[in-house]
From Swiss-Prot:
One of its GO terms (cellular component) is mitochondrial inner membrane. It comes from Proechimys cuvieri (Cuvier's spiny rat). Keywords: Electron transport, Heme, Iron, Membrane, Metal-binding, Mitochondrion, Mitochondrion inner membrane, Respiratory chain, Transmembrane, Transmembrane helix, Transport, Ubiquinone. This is Cytochrome b. Its cofactor is heme b. PROSITE patterns: CYTB_CTER, CYTB_NTER. The gene is MT-CYB. One of its GO terms (molecular function) is ubiquinol-cytochrome-c reductase activity. InterPro entries: Cyt_b/b6_C, Cyt_b/b6_C_sf, Cyt_b/b6_N, Cytb/b6-like_sf, Cytochrome_b, Cytochrome_b_C_euk/bac, Cytochrome_b_N_euk/bac, Di-haem_cyt_TM. Heme b b562 binds at H83, H182. GO terms for biological process: mitochondrial electron transport, ubiquinol to cytochrome c. Component of the ubiquinol-cytochrome c reductase complex (complex III or cytochrome b-c1 complex) that is part of the mitochondrial respiratory chain. The b-c1 complex mediates electron transfer from ubiquinol to cytochrome c. Contributes to the generation of a proton gradient across the mitochondrial membrane that is then used for ATP synthesis.
Length: 379
């Protein structure tokens, strides 16, 4: 009789994905983030489900229902702050995961990479809609500003904005539909994650050397299950420390003021994980230009496979490209800082320079450097 995990139609799929999966023997801790993102997604769905049981998607009671969750529901404060800070952890891991993909040339798995970029867009949309739900000042004005960007689309823009709002301003209809989308999108994300894994398992994992590892594979379990559990414990430690000691560290104080359409907050800004894109949006004085730059700042990831000029896959043995990538990381940190600053001198100039640098590094300097490294190696 064959082993049940190898013969049962359902368990067989799990076996091929998480147990007997042939995995390169040399993948580092940078490969932990995929599983951590999966855990984050599950955590967000579970905490979100419990929050949805007590939340009311109505402009008059939304803010009060959040207060009720934090004060009256058993461990409601814990569920609420785990959900909020869990989103921050999600984005930290997403950016690490993408950074690892760029560093080690994982984007050469075209299907996996492109599904990943679509996933990033979907997660960003979900997080934005979740930010609107507490119906504080930043929720209302954030929703107003970001949805208003669509009015920059020629011809159909203004009509599209009113259609999304369900009226002539951000109101009850907007909140209700945002709640509906925020609830359903994580399940769509889960389905897309499965497709992401399906494409990954067609090719097998990349590894730090960027070389073919078919000759040196080990089973995923127990080697990488135990390694993933270590990552999971470190993640839970960080998340719980953040949630229990300083739950509002990454948030905005304006969230605690109920939404008021007659009073604009001094600085409208999104959560920290969108600030780099927000800085790029603000650095262009033209509305349509800003929106295009915002979209392209993420969509540019789709171009990485086409712009890979090096004859080596990974950056492990390419010091010049490594330097450039770390300059890009520093540049993104500067953009994140600028996104949270008021629109005044010298922040405007710094933001514009950092935005230009961002696109120049990716579109011009990285391919040129790769080409140069090929020449240096006489290839």
């Amino acid at each position: 009789m064959t082993n049940l995990r190898k013969s049962h139609p359902l368990i067989k799929i799990i076996n091929h994905s998480f147990i007997d999966l042939p995995t390169p023997s040399n993948i580092s801790a940078w490969w932990n983030f995929g599983s951590l993102l999966g855990v984050c997604l599950m955590l967000q769905i579970i905490t979100g489900l419990f929050l949805a049981m007590h939340y009311t998607a109505d402009t008059t009671t939304a803010f009060s229902s959040i207060t009720h969750i934090c004060r009256d529901v058993n461990y409601g404060w814990l569920i609420r702050y785990t959900h909020a800070n869990g989103a921050s952890m999600f984005f930290i891991f997403l950016y690490f995961h993408i950074g690892r993909g760029i560093y080690y040339g994982s984007y050469t798995f075209m299907e996996t990479w492109n599904i990943g970029v679509i996933l990033l867009f979907t997660v960003m949309a979900t997080a934005f809609m979740g930010y609107v739900l507490p119906w504080g000042q930043m929720s209302f004005w954030g929703a107003t500003v970001i949805t208003n960007l669509l009015s920059a689309i020629p011809y159909i823009g203004p009509t599209l904005v009113e259609w999304i709002w369900g009226g002539f301003s951000v109101d009850k209809a907007t909140l209700t539909r945002f709640f509906a989308f925020h609830f359903v999108l994580p399940f769509i994300i889960t389905a897309m994650v499965m497709i992401h894994l399906l494409f990954l398992h067609e090719t097998g994992s990349n590894n730090p050397s960027g070389l073919n590892s078919d000759s040196d594979k080990i089973p995923f379990h127990p080697y990488y299950t135990i390694k993933d559990i270590l990552g999971l414990l470190l993640m839970l430690l960080t998340l719980m420390t953040l949630t229990l000691f300083s739950p509002d560290l990454l948030g905005d104080p304006d969230k605690y003021t109920p939404a008021n359409p007659l009073n604009t907050p001094p600085h409208i800004k999104p959560e920290w994980y969108f600030l780099f894109a927000y800085a790029i949006l603000r650095s262009i004085p033209n509305k349509l230009g800003g929106v295009l730059a915002l979209v392209f700042s993420i969509l540019i990831l789709m171009l990485f496979p086409m712009m890979h000029m090096s004859k080596q896959r990974s950056m492990t043995f390419r010091p010049l490209s490594q330097c450039l990538l770390w300059i890009l990381v520093a540049n993104l940190i500067i953009l994140t800082w600028i996104g949270g600053q008021p629109v005044e001198h010298p922040f405007i100039t710094i933001g514009q320079l950092a935005s230009i640098s961002y696109f120049c590094i990716i579109l011009i300097l990285m391919p040129t450097t790769s080409f140069m490294e090929n020449k240096l190696l006489k290839w």
